[in-house]
């Protein structure tokens, strides 16, 4: 799982140790494989392909004990966190669910996805599906802006493939400044 490179049909690479090392995975030739890939490792293909599409029919009887009720969208117009070109994230320094609205407002203003550190999720400032990092979502936006996120290694693992990282944190020694392309040591509320 979490494949970041395909060397050949039975040889893959995947990150381990919070993304600090890459392991070679070899499967026995001729075996059937099921694999998951790390979304952030590949760029989207685009719409200009010329692959042929073959239509096939399947003779499968519909189940008698299940039925389709309806299809609903997840709602909201904010881009999906894992496919957004820009992501605005907040950390524990926002100090409340009400203050976290600033993250949503800025994300909506620029058409970005909204994310959070594990500390912000654990504190109840935002829902779990916004968590970015090793135990959340691995993302690779062109622009990642972090407000009040210290930069624990687990969070950095989730953003290491971002194009440009901007960090705002009042602690000038916060680890996030080590990976940020642009850093501002300031209080978000001033």
Predicted features and spans:
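N-terminal glycine-rich FAD/FM-binding segment characteristic of electron-transfer flavoproteins
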Residues: 1-190
């Amino acid at each position: 799982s979490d494949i970041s490179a395909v060397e050949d049909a039975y040889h893959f690479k995947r990150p381990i140790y919070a993304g600090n090392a890459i392991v070679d995975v070899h499967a026995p030739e001729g075996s059937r494989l099921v694999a998951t890939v790390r979304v952030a490792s590949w760029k989207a293909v685009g719409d200009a392909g010329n692959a042929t599409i073959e239509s096939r029919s399947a003779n499968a009887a519909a189940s008698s004990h299940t039925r389709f009720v309806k299809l609903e969208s997840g709602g909201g117009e904010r881009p999906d966190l894992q496919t957004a070109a820009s992501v605005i994230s907040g950390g524990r320094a926002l100090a409340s669910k009400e203050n976290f609205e600033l993250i949503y407002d800025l994300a909506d203003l620029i058409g970005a996805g909204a994310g959070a550190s594990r500390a912000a999720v654990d504190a109840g400032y935002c829902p779990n599906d916004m968590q970015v990092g090793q135990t959340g979502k691995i993302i690779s936006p062109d622009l990642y802006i972090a407000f009040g996120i210290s930069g624990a290694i687990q969070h950095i693992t989730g953003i290491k493939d971002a194009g440009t990282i901007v960090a705002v944190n009042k602690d000038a020694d916060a680890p996030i400044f080590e990976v940020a392309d642009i850093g501002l040591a300031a209080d978000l509320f001033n």
